[in-house]
């Protein structure tokens, strides 16, 4: 049983504390009895402005900060990301990465995690936006801004039955992200954040590039920043883009044996060139691109086998409410 316990958390969000913030000293006193046990402790942070005061108190810090149609500690109308136009129904999705990096650096060497925004039937209408959960693209980019910082666990808020039935179009995208995480997990767990760079085009955000490197290889991420708020639908819109991404490589990866793109369908060929401690990847990206660099041959084959194994496991349930109407109807009938 013990290896299956992720962490002990009983304080919720101490920065809010049900209306009364719990002081850091009091948080430490409540967590201290666990110091002599094998159970790691966890705290859900919620406000970047003061989470430095809680740094180092728990074994597994994480946070929640949803970027569309949800309560938030930051004032969305103050962001001037899009030519000075402000919106009240969402915030720049890349602020997820900003906050993950902040939490990571404040709490080193502790591993960090993130509550990623998923379907939820309890959020209200914000700023006139009718859709009260993220779109599939909004879900994917929020998750990958977090993953690219080398979080070691991602939690979805929330996967209640009512929420999944209310937003059926999110079941498939979440399943794909989950499968990709399982493909990447060893690289994330054994590696560390290596490089982060934001690229601008004509002075505007263009790409967030990040890498995680470790003994068996590197993960490279290219997150698209040219999405725009649609004034009618009040959702963020994306389009596929061509890009050439330059990533620095540590010495042991300077002559990679394998470079490939990765997604839920497994490894794919990608155009690249390597030299002078860098790799340049040319690809067409929709929302987020994931790439793998390996110092020796064999990782691609292992990932292909792992993808097939994960797919067989998913299919073994013979239940696919995302793709089959009959299965979705069975899911819907479970509602009270």
Label for each model-derived stretch:
Residues 1-257, 265-293:
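Glycan-processing catalytic domains of CAZymes
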Residues 89, 167-170, 174-177, 296, ...:
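Intrinsic-disorder-associated interaction segments
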Residues 275-318:
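C-terminal beta-strand-rich structural cap/linker in extracellular carbohydrate-active enzymes
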